[in-house]
Amino acid sequence: MDIRKTTNEISKKLEEWSKDKPKLIVAIDGYTGVGKTTLLDNLVKLNPDILPVNRDDFQISRTKFKKLYKNAEDRTHIFELEMNDSGKLKKLIQTFRKSSKPYKIKTYDGLSGKINIPKTYNLSKRVMVIEGIFMFHPKLLNKLWDKRVYLKGDIKQIDKRRIAREKKRWGKDYFPETHPDSYFRQVIIALKRYRKVYHPDKQADLVLHI
């Protein structure tokens, strides 16, 4: 299934799920690089009543992350459970449930590693769609979602595309994922454990192959 068909299918489901509901919160999970962000961008173009939320915007600062990473016994767990500010995201979700007023916060800056990008969320929208990894993890915010969508894809091809993209982005500064200290290596290990232990596809209300 291509991204356009996937977008249309999810859009129809959102209309169905949101019928007779004042507010709806939907989480989109899937392997890193499967196309969650692109899909959400396309959904917003199709449905103006969607409030898009990217989990990556809620990452902790790079300074805080490095302290956790340095002292961790198992660094993969940092990426799985502590990389994001779950309390901050939870507050946005809870406010969305009960308010329609603009909600202003500062989000993560991937370049500086600081929490300094101002962002305003339009809580008058009826459907909040949040995309990210580990979205259905029982130790995080899984219980807050009304509906769950899981995206499946060819992991080998996804990894191949991501590596090519990262090599192009970083050039001579590219850090191979096979290196023991590679951040992405830790993420991949955590993701594979998450899929094996918690079976996110089996928790989903809708599973799509893209």
Language model: regions and residue ranges:
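Extreme N-terminal, non-catalytic leader segments
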Residues: 1-25
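Hydrophobic positions on the alpha1 helix immediately C-terminal to the Walker A/P-loop
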Residues: 39
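Small-molecule kinase domains that catalyze NTP-dependent phosphoryl transfer to phosphate-bearing small molecules
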Residues: 168-210
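Conserved glycine(s) of the Walker
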Residues: 35
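Post-Walker A helix-loop "phosphate-sensing" segment adjacent to the P-loop in P-loop NTPases
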Residues: 45-53
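Conserved nucleotide-sensing/catalytic segment adjacent to the nucleotide-binding pocket
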Residues: 51, 60, 64-112
